[in-house]
């Protein structure tokens, strides 16, 4: 069995979506402080983290798209353990729209069918090219509404991409989120290492969210498993 990590590392002030709270990570109690508190028996250090529910590699809950949408603590866990494929879209220029014909060509090139009730991961190469420079937050290509509709028509539960947003920055990205609400589909953002999945066929995707009450999304530890 081979497990490939598709998740960004979390650390203090790691890049976050523009306008959202920063990721803050620090020491709450050192080993030395805890050792003294224990009566010089054992010192157990503790860290703390503060972050938005859309920080790092994460999945959007339907609640993110609309106030009546399902919160992340109610999101079906069976949707987080599914078959998946990865499409090579690295030829798409920065800031460009991915259209249905791009997806159709990528599926044909991959030579593998899209799994029903599974996931489709879109490797644009954006993370590999730009992280952690400022361009990571602004220059990504992404799906447009028509491509989002095409993905939903494939009877998948979600799709994922190696950038901070599913669509290109601006109006198109907002319309893609609106389409996700209307189409009852969601997506994962800020994946990485998708290049390792290219031309390898179907895999098992695992990406379990935290059980945050009324959460609009959640960080996930996303992995692809071959030979499970």
Give the residues covered by each predicted segment.
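Active-/binding-site microenvironments in catalytic and ligand-binding cores
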Residues: 1-228
